[in-house]
Regions:
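Terminal domain-start segments
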Residues: 21-76, 181-189
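Surface-exposed loop and turn segments in beta-propeller and other repeat-based domains
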Residues: 117-138
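Bacterial N-terminal signal peptides
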Residues: 9-20
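Blade-loop segments of beta-propeller domains
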Residues: 71-85, 89
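Short beta-strand elements that form the blades of beta-propeller/WD-repeat-like
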Residues: 39-56, 90-98, 152-160
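Structural motif
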Residues: 52-62, 101-109, 163-174
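Bacterial N-terminal signal peptides that target proteins for export
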Residues: 1-11
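Blade-terminus and WD-like Trp-Asp/Gly-His loop motifs, strongest in beta-propeller folds
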Residues: 32-40, 83-92, 143-154
Length: 192
């Protein structure tokens, strides 16, 4: 539990920074649950039950429950902490803090009509312009955070530091859900 304390602090600070861009972010597992704005759905945390002698790589799960019918479906398993928010009543947006060195963005639809979209360092390394790839490959701390959904576009913040960028780098990116295309820019510069 103590090992995740700095990670939880980081998640809480980031969640507070981007609250205005989507519904309020809550940090799981501490939050326990998050209702949709219209009250039709509830995202719940489910602790994984395992013998204390067994080492388990997956510590928690997120489940989406329809409040009217009581039906539920598992969204994902996660390790560490996850900052989760609703975008309108349609999307559940999550930044999963996988370790102290990386995070990834995941988007789920409330109605289950699409597969979840996961955007992480390996995916970005394949789809960003070639001139940006060294920042992803050569830095050992890379964080991908989803801030909001605008129609069919995800707004992301990508940042990190390491050997390539000891003072860090920061991008604002737009990811197209239908095409999988991305555009990124450094704050205060032209799009790349």
């Amino acid at each position: 539990m103590r090992a995740y304390s700095p990670l939880r602090c980081l998640a809480a600070v980031i969640a507070c920074e981007i609250t205005a861009l989507a519904g309020p972010f809550v940090v799981f597992p501490k939050a326990g649950q998050l209702p949709s704005p219209d009250g039709r759905f509830l995202v719940r945390n489910v602790a994984r039950a395992a013998p204390s002698s067994q080492i388990v790589g997956i510590s928690e799960s997120l489940v989406l429950e329809e409040t009217g019918s009581g039906r539920s479906r598992k969204l994902c398993d996660y390790l560490g902490v996850a900052a989760v928010a609703w975008a309108k009543n349609e999307f559940i947006i999550m930044t999963q803090y996988v370790s102290r060195r990386t995070s990834r963005a995941v988007v789920f639809t409330a109605d289950g009509s699409r597969q979840p979209v996961t955007i992480d360092q390996p995916l970005l390394t394949k789809i960003v312009p070639v001139n940006l790839r060294p920042q992803l490959r050569e830095n050992d701390h890379v964080f991908v955070e989803v801030s909001r959904v605008e129609g069919e576009t995800l707004a992301l913040r990508v940042w990190g530091y390491g050997k390539h960028d000891p003072d860090g780098f920061r991008w604002n990116c737009l990811y197209s859900l239908p095409t999988g295309g991305i555009s990124c820019e450094e704050p205060g510069s032209d799009a790349k």
